[in-house]
């Protein structure tokens, strides 16, 4: 079902930093092993300071991902604490609403934490969202594989475009 994933940094620009380069490479490799094509949006990997100081570019990345007909899923890089700064740029001249209305196919938006605000605004505009994994925290897991619970639901989502039932994990992981 999901063939192409757009990777966006709507809050923190962590994935553009050298100290997570190894993790990012693991995550990109994993997405390809799932059979996915990955489009890294233009500003997603510009680093913490750039992303922090350019909310308009973050908003443009989201709108571009929505408008890109090859993209099936928009995956948030990580949470953060200032996604709210995108709002003026997303709702200026109804750009976000128009992008969603013009999109010829349904897409999935996936992320958590600071991304909660994005889920609400996208849901209100009729865009499908799943409060779930982020790229850095979940896909880039620095072990041989993703955590089994995380992987199960991620695979279900990319294979079917939906998750039937989320069952709580019987295992709790703190630090591995």
Pin down the residues of each PLM region.
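ATP/NTP phosphate-donor binding region
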Residues: 1-70
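Gly/Ser/Thr-rich loops at beta-strand to alpha-helix junctions
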Residues: 11-15, 78-83, 110-117
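Short glycine-/acidic-enriched loop or helix-start segments at secondary-structure transitions
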Residues: 17, 83-86, 119-121, 141
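Short, structured coil segments at secondary-structure junctions
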Residues: 34, 125-126
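N-terminal small/polar loop signature for handling phosphorylated ligands or for N-terminal nucleophile
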Residues: 43-104
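Short, acidic/small-residue loops that bind anionic groups at enzyme active sites
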Residues: 90-121, 128-135
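Conserved anion/nucleotide-ligand pocket segment
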Residues: 128-176
């Amino acid at each position: 079902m999901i063939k192409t994933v757009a990777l966006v940094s709507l809050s923190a620009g962590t994935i553009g930093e050298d100290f997570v380069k190894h993790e990012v490479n693991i995550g990109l490799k994993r997405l390809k092993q799932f059979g996915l094509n990955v489009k890294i949006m233009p500003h997603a990997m510009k680093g913490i300071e750039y992303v922090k100081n350019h909310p308009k570019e973050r908003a443009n990345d989201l709108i571009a991902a929505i408008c890109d007909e090859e993209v099936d899923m928009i995956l948030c890089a990580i949470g953060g604490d200032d996604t709210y700064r995108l709002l003026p740029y997303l709702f200026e001249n109804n750009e976000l609403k128009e992008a969603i209305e013009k999109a010829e196919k349904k897409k999935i938006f996936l992320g958590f934490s600071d991304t909660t605000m994005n889920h609400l605004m996208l849901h209100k505009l009729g865009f499908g969202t799943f409060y779930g994994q982020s790229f850095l925290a979940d896909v880039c897991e620095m072990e041989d594989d993703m955590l089994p619970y995380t992987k199960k639901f991620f695979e279900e989502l990319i294979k079917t475009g939906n998750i039937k039932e989320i069952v709580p994990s019987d295992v709790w992981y703190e630090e591995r």
